[in-house]
């Protein structure tokens, strides 16, 4: 008997909505990354994108433990000398709360074209409203 290999034509992708209110950042990000990769499915194939679409709402209400709210620093660099920028978790949560979950999940996905395709299936919203009602997403409890 041959080993089953999923192909892009045979993969079925579902839509799930995750409420991040009061959830810990790392715990929710790992579950989202697993779902985006498709590792929860029996037909998982490492070189094929078998994951589902994930909609995250209430990203502004995600929490971190300990003193990380004030001490966690996100860095970015422009590429020019002296072009490093830094922003704390608290400031980033006030300015762009979607970016916190996006950065956490993106670091858990593969690097390369397949990882970028998986990341495009993640939709993050700061509030309760999202514009994917037509896809009839199922609620995913994490």
Swiss-Prot record:
SUPFAM superfamilies: Ribosomal protein L13. Keywords: Ribonucleoprotein, Ribosomal protein. Pfam families: Ribosomal_L13. GO terms for cellular component: cytosolic large ribosomal subunit. The keyword Ribonucleoprotein applies. GO terms for molecular function: mRNA binding; structural constituent of ribosome. GO terms for biological process: negative regulation of translation; translation. Transmembrane segments: none annotated. PROSITE patterns: RIBOSOMAL_L13. The keyword Glycoprotein does not apply. Belongs to the universal ribosomal protein uL13 family. This protein is one of the early assembly proteins of the 50S ribosomal subunit, although it is not seen to bind rRNA by itself. It is important during the early stages of 50S assembly. Part of the 50S ribosomal subunit. NCBIfam families: rplM_bact. This is Large ribosomal subunit protein uL13. It comes from Shewanella denitrificans (strain OS217 / ATCC BAA-1090 / DSM 15013). The lineage of its organism: Bacteria, Pseudomonadati, Pseudomonadota, Gammaproteobacteria, Alteromonadales.
């Amino acid at each position: 008997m041959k080993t089953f290999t999923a192909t892009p034509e045979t993969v079925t992708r579902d839509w799930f909505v995750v409420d991040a209110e009061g959830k810990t950042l790392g715990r929710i990000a790992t579950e989202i990354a697993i779902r985006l990769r498709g590792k929860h499915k029996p037909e998982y194939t490492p070189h094929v994108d078998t994951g589902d679409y994930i909609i995250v709402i209430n990203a502004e209400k995600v929490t971190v433990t300990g003193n990380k709210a004030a001490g966690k620093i996100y860095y970015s660099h422009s590429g020019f000398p002296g072009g490093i920028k830094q922003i704390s978790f608290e400031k980033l949560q006030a300015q762009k709360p979607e970016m916190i979950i996006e950065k956490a999940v993106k670091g858990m996905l593969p690097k390369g074209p397949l990882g970028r395709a998986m990341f495009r299936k993640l939709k993050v919203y700061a509030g309760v409203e999202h514009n994917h009602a037509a896809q009839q997403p199922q609620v995913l409890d994490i």
